[in-house]
């Protein structure tokens, strides 16, 4: 019998292990991981493909982490069924794992596109370490690649392939890139930077067909244009990994609904990370927030509750820190401008900087900073804490907010004693 059974081995799982061990030093912890690799930093896989970091640098938690925390780690073990009534998880090999408390931290997987001509050699996803190893084996300088999807995953794949010397085209179905976290004005700045790097960007279009016999030779777009390529990367979004829960009785919407303790509607079964449909305090709705920091925090909270230490989540909202060809971007909170919200924009074309905030009910609820990202952390903190803008509103409008403008009590929280001087 496993006191604690965790399905998954990424950010949420490691957070849960640490959460459990802060409360329970002795309970048995078993981790089932579909992947054969140790926990690695998924946001770094594009840097690994580009050759900016080696394989050791992307390991997030090494073997010493599992041994120190007395974790029974089962790599290459995929869970295929959960029975909450019997408190048993069954793996693909038919082995049964009984448990007292269960955490589902299976993350997400790429959306499979139903394209005519799919299944050819040279067609890849770009989501996990195996995808990167496969790409490393086949790509070579001078090749042509098409990336389907202009979101975070697609653009990081495109950047890495371009840095490896490939001729890259990005095809995005929406009117502009990163449409889930940027507005059109900031996306235009990003698109210009990407085009200058040598990557072709096609928006408002789709890939309809993959050409070639056994190998990828090109694609046909919805517009009818044909593009030659030997590598095709599909990066059109992700979905939570919940198919193995089909007969479990655990409810699944867009993700697995959880309460403030990260517990599902089945007692003793918790969920955390990209697989979760949790509370977004800004939109005041349940939603999936598939970002690394949220996954870790949710796992930590789940782990502590599993071990008997009550802890509640205040919810998670979207936030991202990214860079494309040297252009730094930080976003947080709400994107769309709704009734009653004030939008403030500052754009300096000469410095290639863009700043946009949303204010609602005298509180900062959304932010985009591009180029100059100083004080983005302060703004994100203000969003998280729902801090009234008050006298800071004029500073927010001018984009000149810095720590000295914050109340002394807030500076001490953010920066310690040095911050109040």
Can you annotate each of these PLM segments?
Residues 350-410:
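C-terminal auxiliary extensions adjacent to catalytic cores
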Residues 119-142, 214-220, 225-301, 391, ...:
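FAD-site-proximal beta/loop scaffold in flavoenzymes
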Residues 28, 57-58, 252-255, 309-319:
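A short alpha-helix-loop-beta-strand transition element characteristic
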Residues 8-11, 127-128, 148-153:
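Glycine-rich Rossmann-fold phosphate-binding loop(s) that bind the pyrophosphate
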Residues 1-72, 160-182:
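Beta1-alpha1 glycine-rich phosphate/pyrophosphate-binding loop at the start
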Residues 2, 22, 275-376:
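Mid-to-C-terminal Rossmann-like scaffold of FAD/NAD(P)H-dependent oxidoreductases
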Residues 26-28, 73-91, 97, 163-260:
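A Rossmann-like FAD-binding core segment of flavoenzymes
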Residues 1, 5, 61-146, 220-224, ...:
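FAD-binding core/adjacent interface of flavoenzyme oxidoreductases
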């Amino acid at each position: 019998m496993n006191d604690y059974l965790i399905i998954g081995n990424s950010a949420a799982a490691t957070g849960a292990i640490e959460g459990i061990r802060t409360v329970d030093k002795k309970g048995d912890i078993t981790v089932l991981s579909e992947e054969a690799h140790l926990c690695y930093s998924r946001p770094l896989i594009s840097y690994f493909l580009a050759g900016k970091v080696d394989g050791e640098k992307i390991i997030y938690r090494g073997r010493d982490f599992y041994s120190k925390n007395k974790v029974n780690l089962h790599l290459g073990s995929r869970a295929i069924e959960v029975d909450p009534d019997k408190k048993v998880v069954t793996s693909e090999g038919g082995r049964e794992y009984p448990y007292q408390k269960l955490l589902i931290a299976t993350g997400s997987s790429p959306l499979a596109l139903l394209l005519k001509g799919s299944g050819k050699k040279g067609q890849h996803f770009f989501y996990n370490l195996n995808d990167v190893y496969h790409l490393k084996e086949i790509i070579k300088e001078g090749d042509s690649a098409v990336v389907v999807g202009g979101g975070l995953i697609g653009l990081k794949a495109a950047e890495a392939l371009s840095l490896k010397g490939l001729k890259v085209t990005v095809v995005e179905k929406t009117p502009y890139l990163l449409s889930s976290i940027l507005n059109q004005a900031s996306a235009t700045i990003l698109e210009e930077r990407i085009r200058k790097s040598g990557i072709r960007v096609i928006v408002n279009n789709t890939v309809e067909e993959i050409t070639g016999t056994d190998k990828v030779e090109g694609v046909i777009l919805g517009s009818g244009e044909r593009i030659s390529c030997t590598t095709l990367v599909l990066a059109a979004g992700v979905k939570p990994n919940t198919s193995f829960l089909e007969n479990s009785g655990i409810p699944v919407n867009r993700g697995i609904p959880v309460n403030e303790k990260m517990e599902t509607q089945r007692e003793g079964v918790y969920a955390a990370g990209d697989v979760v449909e949790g509370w977004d305090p800004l939109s005041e709705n349940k939603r999936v927030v598939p970002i690394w920091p949220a996954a870790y925090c949710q796992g930590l909270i789940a782990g502590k509750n599993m071990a008997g230490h009550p802890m509640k989540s205040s919810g998670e909202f979207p936030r991202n820190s990214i860079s494309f060809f040297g252009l730094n971007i930080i976003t947080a909170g709400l994107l769309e401008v709704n009734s009653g919200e004030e939008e403030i924009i500052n754009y300096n074309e000469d410095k290639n900087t863009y700043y946009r905030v949303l204010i609602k009910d005298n509180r900062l609820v959304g932010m985009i900073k591009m180029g100059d990202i100083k004080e983005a952390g302060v703004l994100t903190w203000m969003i998280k804490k729902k801090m009234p803008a008050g006298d800071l509103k004029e500073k927010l409008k001018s984009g000149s907010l810095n720590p000295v403008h914050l109340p002394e009590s807030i500076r001490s929280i953010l920066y310690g004693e040095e911050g109040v001087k």
